[in-house]
Amino acid sequence: MIKQSEEEKDLLDVEFFVLGQAVNYLEHAHVVVRRLSEHHFKSENHKNIFLLIRDILRDRDTISISLIWEEIKRRNLDKSMDVSYLIHMSQNADIPIDLDHHIDFLHEKHVNNLLKEFLDSSFQDFTRYPNRRSPYTLIDQFKERLDDIYEKTSYPRRKHIGKTVYDIFSSGENGKASVIAQIRHRYDYRSRHKIDYVDGLPTGYSSIDEHSIILSRGNFVVIAARPAMGKTAFAIDIALNLVLEQGKAVGFISLEMSPNQIVERIISNLSETSCEQLKRGNFSRDVLSKIESIGTKLKGTHFFICDNKSTDLNTLIDQARELRENQGIDALFIDYLQLIGSSKKAENRQNEIAEISRQLRKLAVELQIPVVCLSQLSRKVEDRGDKRPMLSDLRDSGQIEQDADVILFLHRKDYYSQEATKGLSEIIVGKNRHGSVFSTTLRFNSCTGKFTIQKEAW
């Protein structure tokens, strides 16, 4: 028989006393179940007793030795423990203990065990593949695992939970200005400039911006559509509006096109010359002069395109952080979500996309800039009579719908119907966490990828 260490004996004693309190006192049982899980117990018998107490409390608001013992027998657990063990546990609960302190002890032991496992496996990963992985990729993977440990082991603490509404109203939170200070600043701005204060970046399309500012700091924005609707063109158009009209810095990461192809799209947009003409050299000398002058227009602007040879999520996140830190980008565009690969093993592609979506949302919040990601829609759109997209059409994962702050759909009637008015694109804001949902119409030149304000009726 293996002799127990003093440390292990102390741990089992604490488990024993904590469960004894839960067996004897209903209010203590609720505290134990709320703040611990079966993973906090080393002894298998203690794990089972905890789970039994939890299940009993879900069905009724009472606890007793007899109820626990009935459940033990019903689940055929009486071979590994006797009713005398429960009685002994209950009798020892009369000894006064600091329940909060003992719960904290179990929690810290559990976290220490997870950290030890993490450090051991991380060391093995590091030594198994020396110099074969980017150190930054490893750092991101380690950070991801630590974040997982933190999320899994966070639990309701007994003190200092939350801040009062008045505290946030008057003094803010996490280093931010107070709510009243922010509201006062917006009022002063409106009074001084006689125009509305904009808490974010404009898209450059008044029919969108007058309804809602979708490019707010920390927003995860998804532009979704079926192929040929103009997703990439719309993203480039918004990026150009930010760079040329607002003087902002923008990052563009494309997993689908090379930097040269993106720049050709930009030239087509600004010169109003079709991409096909540019490819064939089929344009006049005047058009060539116009194209050459675009270089002067773009000189000194801050439109950064990443030459992304990897589709790995961690690499993409590294690039985004570097663009924010070194180039000071005000917005990031990613084309497109379904081409991103995750380093985490997932049961299926749907779960992988869900993880990518969660990480992109976290990235937007971390960098405090709008992260605009393009996304495909499923073929279900084609099965409907009007072909009009909706949230359930988001491809591969409903998690995108949950994570995104704003979801915009692009819909072109003329793509599906010869009778529809040519050159119109409906922009549908299907989700807007901080504003209203609406739709508007823009003119779209599919040859140049240029979107413009639509004055006439849809």
Swiss-Prot record:
Signal peptide positions on this chain: none
Residues the entry annotates as binding ATP: A225, R226, P227, A228, M229, G230, K231, T232
Gene Ontology MF term list: ATP binding; ATP hydrolysis activity; DNA binding; DNA helicase activity
One term under GO cellular component: cytosol
Any Pfam family the entry gives: DnaB_C
Catalytic activity of the protein: Couples ATP hydrolysis with the unwinding of duplex DNA at the replication fork by translocating in the 5'-3' direction. This creates two antiparallel DNA single strands (ssDNA). The leading ssDNA polymer is the template for DNA polymerase III holoenzyme which synthesizes a continuous strand; ATP + H2O = ADP + phosphate + H(+)
Keywords, alphabetical: ATP-binding, DNA replication, DNA-binding, Helicase, Hydrolase, Isomerase, Nucleotide-binding, Plasmid, Primosome
Enzyme class: isomerase
Annotated ranges, domain SF4 helicase: 194-458
GO biological process assignments: DNA replication, synthesis of primer
EC nos: 5.6.2.3
PROSITE patterns: SF4_HELICASE (PS51199)
TM ranges: none
Superkingdom as given in the UniProt entry: Bacteria
InterPro entries: DNA_heli_DnaB-like_N_sf (IPR036185), DNA_helicase_DnaB-like_C (IPR007694), DNA_helicase_DnaB-like_N (IPR007693), DNA_helicase_N/primase_C (IPR016136), P-loop_NTPase (IPR027417)
Known function: A replicative DNA helicase, it participates in initiation and elongation during DNA replication. Travels ahead of the DNA replisome, separating dsDNA into templates for DNA synthesis. A processive ATP-dependent 5'-3' DNA helicase it has DNA-dependent ATPase activity.
Subunit note: Homohexamer.
PANTHER family associated with the record: REPLICATIVE DNA HELICASE, REPLICATIVE DNA HELICASE DNAB
Family membership noted in the UniProt record: Belongs to the helicase family. DnaB subfamily.
Official protein name in the record: Probable plasmid replicative DNA helicase
